[in-house]
Amino acid sequence: LKKYQTTHHLTDSDLEMYQRIMDELKKQIIYLNELTNKSRNLKKIEQVELGVASAKGIFKHLVKYPEAITHFSDFLYHKVPEILRASERFLSIKEDKLSTEEITLATNGILSTIRVLSESITDDYERLVSEASEEIALSKKLVERKNG
């Protein structure tokens, strides 16, 4: 842990806050995965939008680059909590096994919200991958110039 702290230039308070944020994020992603697996509708959204998989990818990135956490405040404090709340609401309504036109409209609205949030999380991850790809391409060009 000390090596990690030193390598990433984290103060004791930075490390404590980082650990707290990452512990919470890990729990949230695990819980989101569990919720997703409880519903065919939620599984379908995940198969198309890849929100849970993308959240896991962002988590891995933040483990490797803790200084990047400041770039993911919307992901951490809005998108993940909101997709969890929406998934819980959807499953709660489905568990009641009541079906009216109003309930169907409400659940469809919730699913739409989940889809949009999932897509947005995947957009965040795609941006991450794109930035990494650009950095690698730039490094390659610099090496080629140096060697050429």
Predicted regions and their residues:
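Soluble C-terminal extramembrane regulatory/interaction domains of multi-pass membrane proteins
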Residues: E46-G148
